[in-house]
Amino acid sequence: MTQARTKKNPPLRVGVGGPVGSGKTTLLEMLCKAMRDRYDLVAITNDIYTKEDQRLLTVSGALPAERIMGVETGGCPHTAIREDASINLEAVDRMLARFPDADVVFIESGGDNLAATFSPELSDLTIYVIDVAGGEKIPRKGGPGITKSDLLVINKTDLAPYVGASLEVMESDARKMRGARPFVMGSVKSGQGLDEVIRFIERQGMLGV
């Protein structure tokens, strides 16, 4: 028998997107480890042909295994989070049936291009992750992930000297492309910038209200 939710507010659904290798899974791991003592969390990962990101999160101990669900999309990653999000909407329903009092449902998309966005039916807040190793030109290339996401994370800033990228240029371009929309620069693997991301989620998602 399905349990009923006892909390007055619905769970916050946070979509995490970005290109392959940008650090989405690492960000999700770090968020779960930092927030799990204060909030009831579950996570859903997307891969095209495997459940590798689910495995990585489980092995890292981000959350108990039963709180992490892997989805095999079998096709274009952005279709499963935008045009036909039914497979992920079903996954959210299944996780909430198991954990009806979840405060946050994290949904990590499969690696995709700068045009990827989440359906508003699937995600309340969207975080888009790019990385410095992709080149300082990435922010000014635009695309919905850069310009429309609720929060842009420019990750792996520690690699800038090794790839010849100017953090000042990336910051300036991000401001031009995003206007008033916020962005964070850091290296989530080392924890740099993580607190800013968490504060954004708590503030914009009205957690604890």
UniProtKB/Swiss-Prot annotation:
Entry-linked InterPro entries: CobW/HypB/UreG_nucleotide-bd, P-loop_NTPase, UreG
GO cellular component: cytoplasm
Gene3D superfamilies per UniProt: P-loop containing nucleotide triphosphate hydrolases
GO biological process per UniProt: urea catabolic process
Subunit structure: Homodimer. UreD, UreF and UreG form a complex that acts as a GTP-hydrolysis-dependent molecular chaperone, activating the urease apoprotein by helping to assemble the nickel containing metallocenter of UreC. The UreE protein probably delivers the nickel.
Family assignment from sequence similarity: Belongs to the SIMIBI class G3E GTPase family. UreG subfamily.
Function in brief: Facilitates the functional incorporation of the urease nickel metallocenter. This process requires GTP hydrolysis, probably effectuated by UreG.
Protein name: Urease accessory protein UreG
Organism per entry: Cupriavidus necator (strain ATCC 17699 / DSM 428 / KCTC 22496 / NCIMB 10442 / H16 / Stanier 337)
